[in-house]
């Protein structure tokens, strides 16, 4: 194949970067965002292209991804140099929102656009809350980035993929785990498969 050497190099670089916790070195507007810069740019491109009025994110951690989504949606509301706020929203779901992270997100200038739900993203009551919120929006995008086990991601896909609008996206993060050696993350419940 034409790009097989590049693919091998990319996979090798990604593993070496993860060995060094490279993804923990970045912030978005002051909040840590546990992502590779290339993924951040790709998300920005998807949001700008689709122009959603609701982004649903599973997994909050430090809140950097929520802030990225909210800031991009704020930019979508600038029309001809004037800020014309729409009813855009970012909903973040996490089973454990650490208090110091919650406080930091709540005092961030982008918080006005963010709702956080504490609970498992696959819990029926959480799913129902999100379905209700989604019913009030016309263009929905979904980012799945919480528990990376096969069963959990499959359950999230069943719950949230049907909410994705036509011509929008459901993005599953960290599928790179499939390219790493078995038990690469010994302190995590996910692995290859």
Residue spans of the language-model regions?
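Mobile, glycine- and charge-enriched loop segments
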Residues: 1-41
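S-adenosylmethionine/decaboxylated-SAM
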Residues: 29-31, 38-193
């Amino acid at each position: 194949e034409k790009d097989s050497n590049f693919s091998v190099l990319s996979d090798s670089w990604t593993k070496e970067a993860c060995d060094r916790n490279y993804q923990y070195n970045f912030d978005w507007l002051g909040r840590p965002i546990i992502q590779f810069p290339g993924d951040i740019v790709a998300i920005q491109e998807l949001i700008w292209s689709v122009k959603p009025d609701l982004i649903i994110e599973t997994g909050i951690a430090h809140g950097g991804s929520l802030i990225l989504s909210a800031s991009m949606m704020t930019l979508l509301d600038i029309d001809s140099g004037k800020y014309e706020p729409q009813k855009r929203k970012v909903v973040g779901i996490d089973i454990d929102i650490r208090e110091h992270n919650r406080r930091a997100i709540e005092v961030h200038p982008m918080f006005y656009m963010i709702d956080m739900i504490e609970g498992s993203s696959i819990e029926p009551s959480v799913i129902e809350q999100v379905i209700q919120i989604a019913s009030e929006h016309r263009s929905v995008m979904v980012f799945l980035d919480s528990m990376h086990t096969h069963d959990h991601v499959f359950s999230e896909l069943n719950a949230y993929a049907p909410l994705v609008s036509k011509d929008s996206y459901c993005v599953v993060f960290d599928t790179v785990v499939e390219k790493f050696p078995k038990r690469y993350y010994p302190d995590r419940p996910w692995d290859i498969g």
